[in-house]
Amino acid sequence: MAKEKEHMNLAFIGHVDHGKSTLVGHLLLQAGAIAEQQLAEGEDKFRFVMDRLSEERERGVTIDLAHAKFETDKYEFTIVDCPGHRDFVKNMITGASQADAAVLVVAVDDGVMPQTKEHVFLSRTLGINQLIVAINKMDLVNYDEEKFNALKDEVAALIKTVGYKPSDVEFIPLSAFEGDNITSKSENTPWYKGKTLVEALDDLEAPEKPVDLPLRIPIQDVYSITGVGTVPVGRVETGVLKKGENVIFEPAGVSGEVKSIEMHHEMIEQAEPGDNIGFNVRGVGKNDIRRGDVAGHLDNPPKVAKEFTAQIVVLQHPGVITVGYTPVFHCHTAQVACTFLELVQKMNPATGQVEEENPDFLKTGNAAVVKVKPTKPLVIEKIKDIPHMGRFAIRDMGQTVAAGMCIDLVPAK
């Protein structure tokens, strides 16, 4: 049997009209993931792919990529939702679709837009460390090298402000609509000596499994299975779980020995990051643990925060955020209301520069450092210790109002 290709999650980011859907459609088409006859005739033929599952068809704004998959020589890619989709941020943060890399799409005729900056900042905040820049719609400027270079310099300066190294990033002139430089080199850009998009995707580095970090398994569900007992189910985020080890669930505070681990209905001796498992722990009953608890080893238990300091970006809030605001924080599988205790600093979201100390309020578009207090026990970790356990989305009124990461915490015990 051929060795399975390594898997990568890929996000497409950038301003809403810059051609992300068309690019993804063309990529899937050229990579053979979609049959030609599925495409409708006419101007937006590629977008069809993206539109199939979108209720936003009427508005002419799509974005539900529905986890489309395609393969390159080296990887199997899953395209995770693009920003613009309402649950994008929540999905990325809660781990359903943490992206390993992103393609930033910027239209050459339009240049860097505010949304371009926001998405770049957000990608960095969400821990996407690898970036490819697709300078799209080159057909609209007659494949002009000078226009490409001018925009390349502008985007390079932008991504540098948030900590990407432009020298490590491929900048590719392409046309999503015409298909230039997606899977094969285009004759329209003889001046371009770099990689095609697919070559750049193949040159991404595979994400390393975080096996050396402390064990963390956020619990998704708890089942009672006849003859086995209580079986918590969850995905191993970090570390390794072995049969016979002692684990503790926090904030529940119960612990016991792991009697069995199963994945895909087969018993396994150990589980690694990315594995979705069910496991049975001696002495832990169904009513002792619940969704949102996190399993770890007894000698390095998950941290329960009495309060924590976070860096957040306010994405969409109809009013202002002040001290005392108590929305729901979605962190791994937990959902806990948390109260804003202090607004420490307001920052420029495109540069991270501090604009104001102790602001009175925050509004849409602001980035900030804040102190918050969970209204009931919550496991969260510092982003620098265990990045997978340090991100969260803030939801209120049925929408994601902000996203952020924990930069410091006061333990509850």
UniProtKB/Swiss-Prot annotation:
PROSITE patterns: G_TR_1, G_TR_2. It comes from the Archaea. Residues 14-21 are annotated as: G1. It is found in: Cytoplasm. InterPro entries: EFTu-like_2, G_TR_CS, GTP-eEF1A_C, P-loop_NTPase, Small_GTP-bd, T_Tr_GTP-bd_dom, TRAFAC_GTPase_members, Transl_B-barrel_sf. GO terms for cellular component: cytoplasm. This is Elongation factor 1-alpha.
